[in-house]
Regions:
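Small-residue-enriched flexible segments
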Residues: 1-121, 126-156
Length: 156
């Protein structure tokens, strides 16, 4: 039914242009629609009236290429310093429900190896229902994403 299809479809909206390059996309996920009894929908992210949306689905190639870009940026910002710890928040639906165990372990490995190599760096991971990550120099609410916060010693 239309209602069932809406419950597994991602809605994306256009991201403000100043974030396109840093984010690696001109669109940002607004989430799965919550279908109300009257068949109207509710989205998690606050959206301005009249905003246009597109329907989207997972694109594994884009997920991995985006992850590689994110890890390259993080490693560059570490500037050779070894992380003291990493806090990792992952979307519960995207990471725990949508992906199979093998793919999820591959994604986590793609994140851990560039930062930790084979060293015993503490890595605290959790699933969430919305993730905060930096975008444009400020905390930004994301949905269906991964957020990594790397703790480093200050440069002397």
């Amino acid at each position: 039914s239309v209602v069932e299809a809406m419950q597994i479809t991602l809605f994306v909206g256009e991201l403000p242009s100043q974030y396109h390059q840093e984010y690696g996309s001109s669109y940002i996920v607004h989430g799965l629609p919550l279908v109300n009894p009257d068949t109207s929908i509710t989205l998690v992210r606050k959206t301005p009236q009249g905003m246009k949306f597109w329907l989207a689905k997972h694109d594994e190639e884009k997920i991995f290429s985006g992850l590689d870009k994110m890890m390259g940026d993080i490693v560059k910002r570490c500037d050779g310093r070894k992380p003291l710890a990493v806090f990792h928040a992952d979307c519960a639906f995207r990471g725990k429900i949508s992906f199979n165990k093998i793919l999820k372990e591959e994604l986590v490995g793609h994140m851990q190896y560039p930062l930790c190599k084979d060293e015993g760096i503490p890595w605290l991971g959790m699933y969430s229902g919305g993730e905060y990550a930096m975008l444009g120099g400020r905390h930004f609410f994301h949905i269906f994403t991964t957020s990594l916060n790397v703790i480093l010693r200050r440069e002397s």
